Amino acid sequence: MKTLIKICGIKRLDDLECAIQNGADLIGFVFVKSSPRYIEPSSVTNLLQSVPEKIKTVAVMQHATQNDLDSILDAFKPTYIQTDANDFTSLDLPSNIKKIRVYREEEDFDISSIDDESLALLEGPISGSGQMVNKEFLKKACKRKRLLIAGGLSPENIQSILKEVKPYGVDVSSGVESSRGNKS
């Protein structure tokens, strides 16, 4: 089975085209204002013209509010909304938009807390920091659940991660940047 590939933090057309040419299945647009990968919802519309139908789009949020979600949905309709797992309890999401629930590696993290109905993404303690989750923990988690993994993934380590951890999917962002927020 092919590993799902998500390239996150797309802001420029060149980066989008490169991600598509290199096999991305999912394209992530970051709507977290404090992130160097932040993009205005209205700017995504122009980029979407270059996204083939087979490529799915992800609106990446953090501690999302309904107002945040509504402003994104006014600009475009992503395939997925990605935010912290607990955020979804306070969001009224249209039924045709899927969820990517974000879980972080923490001491009290329980793999059984991940539901099977939506995609789940497991990352390090701080989103977008490039910190890798403990590899042994990932191996155990990926045996039990279909997980996307994020944090510290790059062209230099991705093959060994895929071979050892065997995740359902990978989410790459800072590992393919020439400078913060700019893909290479």
Question: Language-model features: where?
Answer:
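Conserved N-terminal beta1-alpha1 strand-loop-helix module at the mouth
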Residues: 1-184
